[in-house]
Swiss-Prot record:
Originating organism: Staphylococcus aureus (strain COL)
Protein family per UniProt: Belongs to the peptidase C47 family.
Annotated gene: sspP
UniProt site positions, description: Cleavage: 214-215
Gene3D superfamilies xref list: Cysteine proteinases, Staphopain proregion domain
Protein name per its UniProtKB record: Staphopain A
Extra facts: The catalytic maturation of ScpA appears to reside outside the cascade of activation started by the metalloprotease aureolysin (aur).
Pfam families, per the entry: Peptidase_C47, Staphopain_pro
GO biological process: proteolysis
Quaternary structure and interacting proteins, as annotated: In the cytoplasm, prematurely activated/folded ScpA forms a stable non-covalent complex with ScpB.
Residue intervals passing through the bilayer: none
Amino acid sequence: MKRNFPKLIALSLIFSLSVTPIANAESNSNIKAKDKKHVQVNVEDKSVPTDVRNLAQKDYLSYVTSLDKIYNKEKASYTLGEPFKIYKFNKKSDGNYYFPVLNTEGNIDYIVTISPKITKYSSSSSKYTINVSPFLSKVLNQYKDQQITILTNSKGYYVVTQNHKAKLVLKTPRLEDKKLKKTESIPTGNNVTQLKQKASVTMPTSQFKSNNYTYNEQYINKLENFKIRETQGNNGWCAGYTMSELLNATYNTNKYHAEAVMRFLHPNLQGQRFQFTGLTPREMIYFGQTQGRSPQLLNRMTTYNEVDNLTKNNKGIAVLGSRVESRNGMHAGHAMAVVGNAKLDNGQEVIIIWNSWDNGFMTQDAKNNVIPVSNGDHYRWYSSIYGY
């Protein structure tokens, strides 16, 4: 992790949907979604590998239920909507497959992300990995009975409607200290919006499944007082956000804030030097010590059992990640917080993570050290600092 980062080269992506051809399951009498005005998203291709589709259908309910329990939600029924993919402006896919998770009201509650294993970095032996988080669920719910295209770049995600204006709907941490335009024009000559097929992301593709049994069988362990009090904006303070939320949780307080943490450690920095500074592991450990904790550095990902024991003992864990796509730029190194862990009804072990860019938690296979995040990048979990 570095204090000062060179400028990150923005990668423009297009976020569009790709689905597996499937019979209109909405006609099934067992599907009772009230919503009939579906979100229509322009797509290029509706194909999804059989292995990916089967994995999503087999495991989505277990992963979703783990987050429901973390959020203290009641038992519910869910199904999958039509899946989608994310493309760059040149129409090259980012390689992931995304499945909306629908509730019985026809709204999207979560997004299932299935990624091919990154052989060079991943410790997982499986062909694909699966993660679940809220991601773009609230955004998609706002466009019922509309036809849209979704674009993304380093500034965030944009919805493009019939007027070909891209409205910013979800910000991600960005580089430039400038005000974002609420609408932007699509680049001239760009044909990403001229996609021939459409996907109905709120259309059920199978019968709804109750998570009653799954809910009762799952083991959930969480830092009792962990809450998302603030999220990261246009700065390099991921470690500050991570430590402040972990300490707020383990001390059951609201007094820690990312900016104050960064100011404590960098009292003499001003302007953009302060705004875009980061922290080293040594600085993170030092700050924990000044707050009455004894953080320890572990040069690897924590195991499921380690997370389970530390969380039970009210000791917070910071994830230290290295971006797989590029080792250069502002977010080449990134810190995240461990919220807890879960053992699913199928026996699979997962770790619950909070990324300071997000307003929700995400699941992570406990045997996979590559974490997909909400801006399309992947981070290799190479070290941990535990004891906050």
